[in-house]
Amino acid sequence: MNKLLVSLLLTLGLTGLAHAAGDAAAGQAKAAVCGACHGADGNSPAPNFPKLAGQGERYLLKQMHDIKDGKRTVLEMTGLLTNLSDQDLADIAAYFASQKMSVGMADPNLVAQGEALFRGGKIAEGMPACTGCHSPSGVGIATAGFPHLGGQHATYVAKQLTDFREGTRTNDGDTKIMQSIAAKLSNKDIAAISSYIQGLH
């Protein structure tokens, strides 16, 4: 019995170390290397680089691990994460998650179509609304690892949706939910929904 208890405690302890919580204060210094593309506070000034500010820790951590492990290809980040430990990545994720994402503006001509897709999906084609995973306000569900979209650059969102549709981005889990959704979006759909997301808050 005692051996079982000790074994259990050791296992729990090791698990806790393997999934150590991120330290936002420590992450600020470690995130300096990210600033050139993503902005010092995670609000990227360049529309092709995603805003990381206010993004859920779980999502950020998964993306960094996927990029580091080669499960998601981002040419601009090649080699940048190689020498960072799991704790470094957790700290960086915690720092960016603690920041506030800035909000952009949607193209007025695309708002109606974008909102209809985001809130209603394309039911006839079996595409669910984005709100189910990303919430009506676009903040996502951090605990489930569903990303915060509201305020994200339209250029970046459009690129990701296109990559999911074309199969060049595949790190959306075993269910391939984003690939199946993006497959039902036309170029015009992607432009409208991406613009709507940029202005969503």
Swiss-Prot record:
List the signal peptide residues. 1-20
- Annotated heme c 2 binding sites: 130, 133-134, 178
Please give the Pfam families that the UniProt record associates with this protein. Answer: Cytochrom_C
Q: Which GO cellular component terms, listed alphabetically, does the Swiss-Prot or TrEMBL entry include? A: periplasmic space
What's a Gene Ontology MF term here? cytochrome-c oxidase activity
Residues given in the record as heme c 1 binding sites: 34, 37-38, 77
Q: Per its UniProt record, what PANTHER family does this chain match?
A: CBB3-TYPE CYTOCHROME C OXIDASE SUBUNIT FIXP (PTHR33751), CYTOCHROME C4 (PTHR33751:SF9)
Which function does this protein serve?
Answer: Diheme, high potential cytochrome c believed to be an intermediate electron donor to terminal oxidation systems.
Protein name per its UniProtKB record: Cytochrome c4
The species this protein belongs to is Pseudomonas aeruginosa (strain ATCC 15692 / DSM 22644 / CIP 104116 / JCM 14847 / LMG 12228 / 1C / PRS 101 / PAO1)
